[in-house]
Amino acid sequence: MAPAAWLRSAAARALLPPMLLLLLQPPPLLARALPPDAHHLHAERRGPQPWHAALPSSPAPAPATQEAPRPASSLRPPRCGVPDPSDGLSARNRQKRFVLSGGRWEKTDLTYRILRFPWQLVQEQVRQTMAEALKVWSDVTPLTFTEVHEGRADIMIDFARYWHGDDLPFDGPGGILAHAFFPKTHREGDVHFDYDETWTIGDDQGTDLLQVAAHEFGHVLGLQHTTAAKALMSAFYTFRYPLSLSPDDCRGVQHLYGQPWPTVTSRTPALGPQAGIDTNEIAPLEPDAPPDACEASFDAVSTIRGELFFFKAGFVWRLRGGQLQPGYPALASRHWQGLPSPVDAAFEDAQGHIWFFQGAQYWVYDGEKPVLGPAPLTELGLVRFPVHAALVWGPEKNKIYFFRGRDYWRFHPSTRRVDSPVPRRATDWRGVPSEIDAAFQDADGYAYFLRGRLYWKFDPVKVKALEGFPRLVGPDFFGCAEPANTFL
C-alpha cells in the first residue's frame, strides 16, 4: 500500500495519535500527484458530494493535474471552499441577491461542538470566537446556539489538513480556508477549517478566525455565496473589522428563520408583606375543580410534541397514544407559566414554538419557556379577533390557519403575518360547520374540527368532512359512556 493511502487507512487511525496524523498528511504536491479520478471514485462509493444535494446543477470539480503546485496565495485569493452556486441558481435568486442552499434547520435551538483546535490559539480564545461568530446570526433570528463537549452536536467544528475524509481536501496555507455543509445533506452541520492557515483573531496579519467562522456558519444555516457588496457571505476573504452582517446577509437568514423574538417584558413584582406589618391581603383561593371532560366544550386543542392537549377553563388534558396521562387534568400554568385563562386557540409551529391566543393578544413559548407576550394580534396582520381556532395543516406543518366565525386566514410564522387582513370564507372547508371552537391535525394528516361537544373529521385527500360525522368528543377521546339520548 502506498504511504499516502496507508495514512488515510483505518490502521493508521488506530495506531497513530490524531495530531501525528495531521503532521504526516501528504503535502499539496503529493495530493496533486494522486490519480486524477481517485477522489471521484471515492465519491461514487459514498454517493454524491454533500453540496450536490442542494445544488443539482453544480459543475463537477476539475480533475487534479500533474503540474507542480505554486503557493496557493499566488494562484488565487483566499476564499471559502464551498462551491459557488451555478449560473441557473444565481439567476433565479438575482432579484433578492442572497442565495439559499435549498435546506434549513427545522428547529431553532442548535448545539455545537469543537473537536480539534488550531495550534496558534489557546482553546478558550477559540471557544469565545466561535460563540461570537454564532452570535452574529442569533442576534438577527430566533436561533440559539449551545456548546456541548461530547456526543454528536448539530454543528461539528474541526481543524484538519489536506485530505480529511470528505472529498474536499485543503491545500495548505492560503487558497481554501474552510468549508461547511448545508442543512438537509448527509454531513449537515459539519464545519472544517484548514489547520495550516495562520489563524488570528482581529488581526489582518493572518486569517481572522472570527470572520471565516461566521461565514461558514452562514452555510451551516442554509445560505450560499452571494455577490452582494460587503456581504459576509461573499466567497472571497477580505479582512474587515469589526465583524457585522450586511443587509443582504440579514435578509437571507431571516428569509429562512424569521426575525428574532422580541424581548419578553416582565413586570416587577410587588413586594410581599413584611414581618410585623398588618395587611388586608386575602389568601389566594384554591383553583376550582376541573370541568368534566365528558360534558365539556373545549376552548382549544393542539398537538404539541406529538401529544394531544385539550384546554378548558385554565386546565389541560394530556393524551398520549389515545390515553389520558396520569396527573391530568392539571392547571395549564403548570407547563406554561404566565399563560392566561382561558385560551381561545393554540398551535405548535414547525420550529417547536407554541402559540396561545386570548382576546386581542397572543403569547409564544419555546417548550415551557416564555419568549414573547403578551403581544397584540395586530402585529400578525389581524384586524378582527378573537381567534376561535388555529389549525396546523400539512405534513411539514407549513400551513397554519386561523378561524373566527365564518372566516379564516392563512398565517406564516416565519414572517409573523397573515396572507391578507381580508379573510376567506370557511365554506372552503366542505362539510365543516362555522363557528368552530378548536381544531387540530393528527399524525395521519386528518384534521379535526370541534364545536361544542361534537367534532368533525376532515379528509385531506377528498378535502371534505368524512361521512358519519359529527361524533361526540367525550366517548371517542376520553372513553366516556355514550349518552342514552342520541338527539344532541
UniProtKB/Swiss-Prot annotation:
Family annotation (Pfam families): Hemopexin (PF00045), Peptidase_M10 (PF00413)
The Hemopexin repeat ranges on this chain: 291-339, 340-382, 384-432, 433-480
Family: Belongs to the peptidase M10A family.
Region of interest (Disordered), ranges: 41-93
Protein species of origin: Homo sapiens
Chain span(s) of sequence motif Cysteine switch: 78-85
Function field: May play an important role in the progression of epithelial malignancies.
Enzyme Commission identifier(s): 3.4.24.-
Free-text comment on the cofactor: Binds 1 Ca(2+) ion per subunit. Binds 2 Zn(2+) ions per subunit.
Binding residue positions for Ca(2+): D171, G172, G174, I176
Protein known as: Stromelysin-3
Low complexity bias spans: 50-79
Tissue expression notes: Specifically expressed in stromal cells of breast carcinomas.
Record PTM: The precursor is cleaved by a furin endopeptidase.
Gene: MMP11
Binding residues annotated for Zn(2+) 1, in chain numbering: D166, H179, H192
Binding-site residues for Zn(2+) 2, renumbered to this chain: C80, H215, H219, H225
Disulfide bonds: C294-C480
Native organism taxonomy: Eukaryota, Metazoa, Chordata, Craniata, Vertebrata
Record's GO cellular component terms: extracellular matrix; extracellular region; extracellular space; Golgi lumen
GO molecular function: metalloendopeptidase activity; serine-type endopeptidase activity; zinc ion binding
Range of residues in the leader sequence: 1-31
Residue numbers annotated as active site: E216
Gene Ontology BP term (one): negative regulation of fat cell differentiation
Key words, A-Z: Calcium, Cleavage on pair of basic residues, Collagen degradation, Disulfide bond, Extracellular matrix, Hydrolase, Metal-binding, Metalloprotease, Protease, Repeat, Secreted, Signal, Zinc, Zymogen
Domain comment as written in the entry: The conserved cysteine present in the cysteine-switch motif binds the catalytic zinc ion, thus inhibiting the enzyme. The dissociation of the cysteine from the zinc ion upon the activation-peptide release activates the enzyme.
Swiss-Prot/TrEMBL cofactor(s): Ca(2+); Zn(2+)
